[in-house]
Amino acid sequence: MPRLEEHCWSCSCSTSVKTKDLSSAGWIVCKTGEMMSIITSVLSHAYGSLHSLQSANLIRRGLVLFIVGVVLALVLNLLQIQRNVTLFPEEVLDTLFSSAWWIPLCCGTAAAVVGLLYPCLDHHLGEPHKFKREWASVMRCIAVFVGINHASAKLDFANNVQLSLTLAALSLGLWWTFDRSRSGFGLGLTTALLATLIAQLLVYNGIYQYTSPDFLYVRSWLPCIFFSGGVTVGNIGRQLAMGSTEKIHND
């Protein structure tokens, strides 16, 4: 009998210990689930905030690039008109195109697209920047671009071929000085080809025209202007992207 009582007591003790272990394990599992839920909620909220911040920065950068493109278009087109490089036909003056309001808008939109594409290509290609980016370098790039456009309107060469070769060398020098990236060269070249094609179509349809065209309907140096403009806008877009990234990290 004593042995039976001892056996029953040991069984009851072991059962109570197992029950306590199971309850402890259940409590740990419950608390772990609560902690995982809290962590998931915090991470989801952080991701949502980061995504919203990135979207806001993208819109802000696009607006800045659009404004820059509009301002550059107004200034550079004024230089061309003063030298009678570009003209508007008389029949167009009676239409909505007479004020050429669409030129700055188109240039602003193109600047926003190109400026946003440059940092995206850098990120996807994994191509590091050759230089330490700063706004002083970007401003010098803008000054050189305006100088190239001014030279296209002011300089007088014996023929347009010499002018085109000179501007091509200056445009490549601008890319080499302020960029030197394959993505920058490729996107600048693509911008030059597409913009020149669009200009050809506009002139062909009588909306726009150039005096003394020597490259189908436009001037032969026009692709050089578009190339240097694409590189310039790309540098602005990269600088804006770097500033936005640093701000996000600080936040």
Curated annotation (Swiss-Prot):
Q: What is this protein called?
A: Insulin-induced gene 1 protein
Q: What does the record give as the function of this protein?
A: Oxysterol-binding protein that mediates feedback control of cholesterol synthesis by controlling both endoplasmic reticulum to Golgi transport of scap and degradation of hmgcr. Acts as a negative regulator of cholesterol biosynthesis by mediating the retention of the SCAP-SREBP complex in the endoplasmic reticulum, thereby blocking the processing of sterol regulatory element-binding proteins (SREBPs). Binds oxysterol, including 25-hydroxycholesterol, regulating interaction with scap and retention of the SCAP-SREBP complex in the endoplasmic reticulum.
Membrane topology per the record? Multi-pass membrane protein
Disulfide bonds, which pairs? Answer: none
Q: Out of the domains of life, which is the source?
A: Eukaryota
Which keywords fit this entry according to its UniProt record?
Answer: Cholesterol metabolism, Endoplasmic reticulum, Lipid metabolism, Lipid-binding, Membrane, Steroid metabolism, Sterol metabolism, Transmembrane, Transmembrane helix
The main location is endoplasmic reticulum
Site-annotated residues for Required for the recognition of 25-hydroxycholesterol: 145
Transmembrane region positions? 59-81, 101-118, 134-156, 160-178, 184-205, 220-237
Q: Where is this motif: KxHxx?
A: 245-251
Q: Which residues lie on this side of the membrane: Extracellular?
A: 82-100, 157-159, 206-219
Q: Give the UniProt entry's GO cellular component terms.
A: endoplasmic reticulum; SREBP-SCAP-Insig complex
Spell out the molecular function terms from Gene Ontology: oxysterol binding
Write out the annotated subcellular location.
Endoplasmic reticulum membrane
* Comment text on domains: The KxHxx motif mediates association with the coatomer complex.
Q: Which stretches are Cytoplasmic in the membrane topology?
A: 1-58, 119-133, 179-183, 238-251
Pfam families linked to this entry:
INSIG (PF07281)
**Species this chain originates from:** Danio rerio
Family of this protein? Belongs to the INSIG family.
